[in-house]
Structure formats: structure tokens, C-alpha cells
């Protein structure tokens, strides 16, 4: 009788991955323009239960601070359609917001929070994933109860 195999505990690969090696990053700003391709947008649409994701892009600036924390700033935008919670019709939306995230290595994991920003996100193997960070920001910005324009409020 074969032994049951242990579950693979690795994280699934993100649908939209844009890795940035911050371990070799100096103090100079690193500018990054990222845009999801059609395959990535389709996978993200499935993940976030969207009818469609026509565009997801970001213009980012990464800078390592004196304390070793990497600050990511910029702006993201998306063109998408969610399903109306009443009629199930597509509800188009354009979303976007400023980005201000902080990433710190294992040495910073037990550090105090960064003023008003909270704790920095972890850096794994000296790399951060700018695409996944922006995808998560979009996910948080989605309307939890989208309604078609002609549907009255409850």
C-alpha cells in the first residue's frame, strides 16, 4: 500500500507576477511600469470572480530607505466588470488608487510598526512581487456588492 504523499505547502504561483530583486537595490529609485497581459488578466478575473478584466497596470517607484525598508509608491488602475448581485448583469467599473506599501526583510519582522503605516510586508529571498501586490490592492478596492445602474438600492 503506497504511503499518502504529504501536501505540497508551497504557495501557488501568482497570476500576475513581477518580481523585483531588492537585495541588490541601492539607494537610487527604481521605476517600474507593469501591465497585465491577456492571459494574466483572465486568470486574475477568475481569482477575483470578475466578468472581465480589460486592463490592469501600475506605474511604481521603489526606493530603499536608510533602515533597509523598501518603500513602493505610485499609482495603479484597472478597467473591469463585476456581476450585479441582483440581476447578474455585468457592471463595468474603472478603479485606481495610489500605492504606498512597505517591505522589510526577516531582520525587520520583529521591528516596531512604521509610524502610521503598520508593519512592513515580508521580503522573501530578497525579492518582492510588485504584480501580486498591485493585484491585492485591486482585490481590496472591488465593490463587494456591485449593482447595475438601474437596480434600486435596498
Label for each model-derived stretch:
Residues 2-154:
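Acidic and generally charged, gly/proline-rich low-complexity regions
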Amino acid at each position: 500500500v503506497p504511503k499518502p504523499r504529504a501536501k505540497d505547502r508551497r504557495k501557488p504561483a501568482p497570476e500576475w507576477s513581477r518580481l523585483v530583486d531588492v537585495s541588490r537595490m541601492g539607494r537610487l529609485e527604481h521605476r517600474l511600469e507593469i501591465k497585465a497581459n491577456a492571459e494574466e488578466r483572465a486568470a486574475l478575473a477568475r481569482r477575483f470572480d470578475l466578468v472581465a478584466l480589460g486592463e490592469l497596470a501600475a506605474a511604481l517607484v521603489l526606493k530603499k530607505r536608510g533602515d533597509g525598508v523598501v518603500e513602493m509608491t505610485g499609482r495603479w488602475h484597472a478597467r473591469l466588470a463585476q456581476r450585479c448581485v441582483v440581476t447578474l448583469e455585468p457592471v463595468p467599473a474603472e478603479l485606481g488608487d495610489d500605492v504606498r506599501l512597505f517591505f522589510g526583510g526577516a531582520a525587520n519582522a520583529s521591528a516596531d510598526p512604521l509610524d502610521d503605516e503598520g508593519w512592513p510586508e515580508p521580503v522573501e529571498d530578497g525579492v518582492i512581487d510588485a504584480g501580486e501586490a498591485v493585484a491585492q490592492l485591486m482585490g481590496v478596492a472591488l465593490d463587494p456588492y456591485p449593482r447595475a445602474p438601474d437596480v434600486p438600492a435596498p
